[in-house]
Amino acid sequence: MDLLIVGLGNPGSNFFHTRHNVGFELVDNLVIKNGLSLKKVKNYEYSDFNFENKRIVLIKPLTYMNLSGNIFPSVFAKFYMKIANLLVVVDNVDLPLGKCKLRKVGGTSTHNGLRSISLSLGSTNYGRLYIGVGSNNESSLREFVLAKFRGSELERIKSVFEFLSEEILGIDESNFEHKVATINSSSF
């Protein structure tokens, strides 16, 4: 099964290492780990390569989080992919820091990036990889997700990226449930 991995985040160096940008940073980690580079097209960056006899396309939307869905008509047309190939990597404030959750389908909850994608696709039937960024009652949700990780938090998230970089490229229909068990039982 070919895989279209879309990491959500906000473009610009001021968002680097923020909780909302874990999707971007996982894509960056995959690019570096596999000796790739990102190419820019209109409103997204991508890398297209083969891994274990399947096509992998990595995407970083450059539309800002709340408009992430805007890229999908051109992405699906350019790469000849379908919703069945899609895995969206996104932050989740309902999961503890470092906890991950892989799902085949799901809702949008309070996540505007997922809401934008679901509206654009007309469906919520696409894969999601949630990365727990913790929660905080001291600030608003917006302030919290746009805040940078601190010291030991950043080290934990980097460990998550290393682990996920080993796990997600191998996802396919035959091992999806095994990958769910492996990823969902991990914690950093």
Curated annotation (Swiss-Prot):
An individual GO BP term: rescue of stalled ribosome
Gene Ontology CC: cytoplasm
Cystine bridges: none
Source organism (scientific name): Borrelia hermsii (strain HS1 / DAH)
Transmembrane segments: none
Role of this protein: Hydrolyzes ribosome-free peptidyl-tRNAs (with 1 or more amino acids incorporated), which drop off the ribosome during protein synthesis, or as a result of ribosome stalling.
Sites marked Stabilizes the basic form of H active site to accept a proton: 91
Cellular compartments annotated: Cytoplasm
Domain of life: Bacteria
Main localization category: cytoplasm
The family this protein is said to belong to: Belongs to the PTH family.
Active-site feature positions: 20
InterPro entries associated with the record: Pept_tRNA_hydro, Pept_tRNA_hydro_CS, Pept_tRNA_hydro_sf
Protein's UniProt name: Peptidyl-tRNA hydrolase
Alphabetic keyword roster: Cytoplasm, Hydrolase, RNA-binding, tRNA-binding
Assembly and interaction partners: Monomer.
